[in-house]
Regions:
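Active-site microenvironment for binding and transforming phosphate-containing groups
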Residues: 1-147
């Protein structure tokens, strides 16, 4: 799994988790059907994840990526968590059961519409943070840069 060391700037592609030191920038390229999760630490650093609807070989599945972010964050204090991207493409349950994990013939939940509140709760629960720290923003396709 791609967990990279803390650096000044980092590019996180689908299924990757990484960290930047205070003042660093997280770059999430080609966010289309994905969501990005950025944990802003009290010391100014950031832990980020580029969550993909479908697993990229060798990278984190959607139902494992929050655990990787939580492990990376550790006991450090969290100021805020930002979830951005294709909000309408994601059911909150994808963070607990990835699309790939459904058996043939098993019904995969399909979102009827955007559920920012459900996504915020799912991310807060997955990271062990309070719901009040999590914001969700639907963004058009493209690269995301978090300074």
């Amino acid at each position: 799994m791609a967990v990279t060391p803390a650096t000044a700037n980092i590019r996180l592609t689908e299924g990757q988790v990484g960290e930047v030191a205070p003042g660093g920038t997280l770059i999430y390229p080609g966010v289309t059907s994905c969501l990005t999760v950025t944990v802003r630490l009290r010391d100014g650093g950031k832990v980020g994840a580029h969550a993909s609807l479908f697993q990229v070989p060798g990278e984190y599945r959607s139902d494992r990526i929050l655990a990787a972010v939580k492990q990376r964050t550790g006991a450090r204090r969290v100021r805020a968590v930002e979830v951005r991207g294709a909000v309408g493409a994601w059911a909150p349950s994808y963070f607990t059961k990835a699309i790939e994990s459904y058996a043939e013939g098993e019904r995969v939940p399909v979102p009827a519409g955007p559920d920012p509140e459900g996504l915020a709760r799912a991310v807060a629960d997955g990271l062990g943070q309070s719901r009040g720290k999590v914001t969700v923003e639907d963004l058009p396709d493209g690269d995301q840069r978090v300074d």
